[in-house]
Regions:
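C-terminal capping/extension segments of zinc metalloprotease domains
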Residues: 21-77, 107-127, 166, 211-297
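Short, highly charged
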Residues: 72-109
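Acidic helix-start/capping segments at beta-turn-to-alpha-helix junctions
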Residues: 90-104, 116-124, 180, 244-245
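Sec/Tat signal peptide C-region and signal peptidase I cleavage site
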Residues: 15-21
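Catalytic Zn2+-binding segment of zinc metalloproteases
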Residues: 143, 150-151, 160-176, 188-189, ...
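Bacterial N-terminal signal peptides
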Residues: 5-15
Length: 297
């Protein structure tokens, strides 16, 4: 048991500089400024550098089948839009810690190559969001519900699963939003700021609200698997779902979550049906309560 614990500590020491390098606030500073001030020129020029060349010499997004670089750019813009509404918690130690945990769990997935970014935002709502390209946000209200690192890993793994399975990207691809954007972006990506921002803003709405039940159930199953692979006690996510399920339906902190997600009781039932007693044989998983980062306020 002690060997497993010290191995996890060693791995975290390796990924600590990487987590610092992937600071979400610094990465999206210009995008957030653009979303709040309406200045998107710099963002569009960056987007252009990741796209293919159009007939007029301008760079174009391949919205229908984006490359990994384009997926990252889409997620970057959408996340910047979300952060324009709710800022990151001003606690560098918290953000660093969440990035360390998230990056370690994400490395257990088949999209370990993505430059994953994680952040905690100033909102007392209980919720979490993911965007294409490896961007994951959880609210301060949800973080308050957590009691140990395994539970944090469980929450993050659910959002990681959404990215790995391209749940939000598929909705964007199916929607008329991409048809709206493709006509413009296929010509000149910097031509019309209003239409571009409509696409990005609506994408943020989709990432925050709109997934069907099957996608949520799949993310729960995959999340438990990723958490277990990462060496954590596998019941972190179910414990969080159970705690949220005990929150009154009329409480404002869960109003959006209950409106846009299956009820936690239904999610727990589906998890039980899918997993059964197979986790009973998992030994040595850690909760790591002793190093769980406590909020300062």
């Amino acid at each position: 048991m002690r060997v497993i614990y010290f191995f996890l500590v060693f791995i975290f020491a390796i990924f600590m500089p990487q987590a610092q390098a992937l600071d979400l606030g610094e990465t999206l500073k210009d995008v957030v400024k653009g979303s709040t001030a309406g200045n998107t020129t710099g963002n569009q020029s960056k987007a252009s550098s990741t796209s293919s060349t159009g007939s007029e010499g301008k760079k174009t997004f391949n919205w229908k089948s984006p490359s990994p670089q384009e997926e990252i750019q889409i997620g970057r813009e959408i996340t910047g839009n979300l952060l324009g509404a709710s800022a990151l918690v001003k606690d560098a130690a918290l953000q660093k810690y969440v990035n360390q945990v998230g990056r370690w769990v994400a490395n257990q997935s088949e999209r370990a190559d993505l430059p994953w970014h994680f952040g905690v935002i100033e909102s007392e709502d209980i919720n979490a969001f993911a965007a294409p390209g490896g961007y994951v946000i959880i609210t301060k209200g949800l973080y308050r519900k957590l009691e140990n690192e395994a539970q944090l890993a469980g929450v993050l793994s659910h959002e990681i699963a959404h990215v790995v399975r391209s749940h939000h990207l598929k909705i964007l691809q199916k929607s008329q939003l991409l048809d709206l954007g493709a006509g413009l972006l296929g010509k000149q990506i910097g031509k019309d700021n209003q239409v571009i921002q409509k696409v990005i803003g609506s994408g943020a709405e989709i990432c925050a609200r709109s997934l069907d039940k099957s996608a949520e159930f799949e993310a729960d199953r995959m999340g438990v698997s990723l958490t277990t692979r990462a060496g954590y006690e596998p019941y972190g996510l179910p414990e969080v779902l159970q705690a949220i399920g005990q929150t009154g339906k009329n409480e404002s902190s869960v109003a959006l979550l209950f409106k846009t997600h299956p009820h936690p009781d239904d999610r727990l039932l589906k998890l039980d049906e899918a997993i059964g007693n197979r986790l009973d044989n998992v030994k040595g998983g850690k909760t790591l309560s002793n190093r769980f980062y406590k909020l300062k306020n």
